[in-house]
């Protein structure tokens, strides 16, 4: 009996150790995956913002929209490179598609597991968004605790949470992206907060230059 008791204690200790190792491995894998997603999300935001285009005479199509809060929104129009995500859907010579000028809409939405996701939808600048983009946007990051976009206001000499100058685009934006763990999955990774300051190389083309004199 004593031998059996000792054996059970050893088995329990081995199982406890194995469980701890498994949980640590899950947390490490989850953290690494989310860190990679965070890098991809920030790279996508940076690439698109540096390709932004804006025309003062057509602000209906080229407006710059920022909305911070629980359901943050960032929307603008950009001429995108060939390596941009989902580009082959919009640029395909065989199908007669050449829509590299597209409106991008980044939003924070509730995902299928009740977590907050950062998603991206795209549509050609003169066309409505199709059903596929509406229903299955590109998910850039899961477990988003915070996504804010601040714009540098040269008049206030400070960062502002919104952008009310609708006929211009900001020269500099600051993006804050905070991703957290997923306790619902049985483990919790630490929060990962990243702030990125991005200078926008474009300016809004004045109406007089667009329509001529």
Regions from the language model: what does each represent?
Residues 141-213:
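Short linear sequence signals and composition-biased patches located at protein termini or domain-edge surfaces
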Residues 1-18:
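N-terminal single-pass transmembrane signal-anchor helix
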Residues 98-105, 137-138, 192-197:
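Well-ordered beta-strand positions in beta-sheet-rich domains
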Residues 69-71, 108-115, 139-146, 167-171:
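A short, structured loop/turn motif at beta-sheet edges
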Residues 13, 17-132:
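Extracytoplasmic beta-strand-rich oligomerization domains located immediately C-terminal to a leader/signal peptide
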């Amino acid at each position: 009996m004593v031998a059996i008791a000792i054996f059970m204690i050893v088995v329990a200790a081995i199982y406890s150790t194995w469980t701890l190792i498994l949980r640590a491995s899950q947390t490490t894998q989850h953290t690494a995956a989310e860190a990679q997603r965070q890098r991809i999300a920030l790279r996508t935001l940076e690439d698109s913002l540096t390709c932004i285009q804006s025309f003062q005479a057509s602000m209906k199509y080229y407006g710059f929209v920022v909305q911070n809060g629980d359901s943050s929104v960032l929307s603008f129009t950009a001429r995108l490179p060939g390596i941009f995500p989902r580009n082959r859907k919009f640029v395909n010579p065989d199908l007669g598609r050449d829509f590299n000028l597209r409106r991008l809409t980044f939003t924070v939405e509730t995902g299928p597991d009740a977590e907050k996701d950062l998603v991206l939808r795209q549509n050609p600048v003169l066309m409505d968004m199709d059903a596929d983009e509406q229903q299955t946007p590109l998910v850039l990051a899961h477990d988003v605790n915070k996504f804010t976009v601040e714009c540098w206001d040269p008049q206030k000499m400070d960062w502002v949470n919104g952008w009310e100058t609708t006929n211009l685009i900001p020269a500099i934006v600051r993006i804050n992206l905070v991703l957290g763990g997923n306790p619902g999955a049985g483990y919790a990774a630490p929060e990962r907060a990243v702030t990125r300051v991005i200078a926008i190389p474009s300016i809004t083309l004045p109406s007089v230059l667009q329509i001529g004199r």
